[in-house]
Amino acid sequence: SSSSAASDVYKRQAENVAKQYSISRTEQQEFAISSHQKAFEAQSKGNFNNEIVNIGTCSQDSNIRPGSTQEKLDGLKLAFDQNGTVTAATSSPLTDGASATLICEEQYARDNNLEILARIVSTSVQGCEADTMGLGPIGASQKALERAKLTIKDIDIVELNEAFASQSLA
């Protein structure tokens, strides 16, 4: 199926990026543990309460693993390549979710008493090889920052998680 083929590309690219940038399993696991700890802390403080709609069977992110340790993650099998570095803890989980964002003109938001959460000051896209597609956001982000006359130091928050830790670390 096409979804299976797409999934295989994701899997391969995670290993390819790790290999290209010499990112070890330990480094990916450290990133995953830190990601889970930060997410658990934010969830415990209620920081996600306005972002997650309770649908009865689910009221919070069930993929946060606050008990993750290097020892526990060391026990996981390699996920995709028996000579690789990526495990279930450092790749994208099988999960369901949905998201919606309203993007509108500033005047429309003001006229309709909508809270303005952000301004889009620049956009960009970046083509890249399929076997390292996880690197695409790097070039796109650099180009968008340049167009906006900003640097990464001007950005307050960058959200990255453990899903394919190799690309986040690259």
Q: Language-model segments: what does each one mean?
A:
Residues 1-6, 10:
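Single conserved hydrophobic/aromatic residue that forms the stacking wall/gate
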Residues 7-8, 19-33, 86-100, 121-147, ...:
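Active-site pocket-shaping loop/turn-to-helix segments
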Residues 14, 18-21, 25, 32-47, ...:
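Structural signal for hydrophobic packing residues in well-ordered secondary-structure cores
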Residues 14, 28, 73, 96, ...:
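Conserved small-residue
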Residues 27-111:
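N-terminal extracellular/periplasmic Venus flytrap/periplasmic-binding protein-like
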Residues 59-64, 130-137, 162-170:
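Short glycine/threonine-rich loop-to-helix capping motif typified by GTGT followed
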Residues 109-110, 146-152:
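Structural alpha/beta core scaffold segments of enzyme domains
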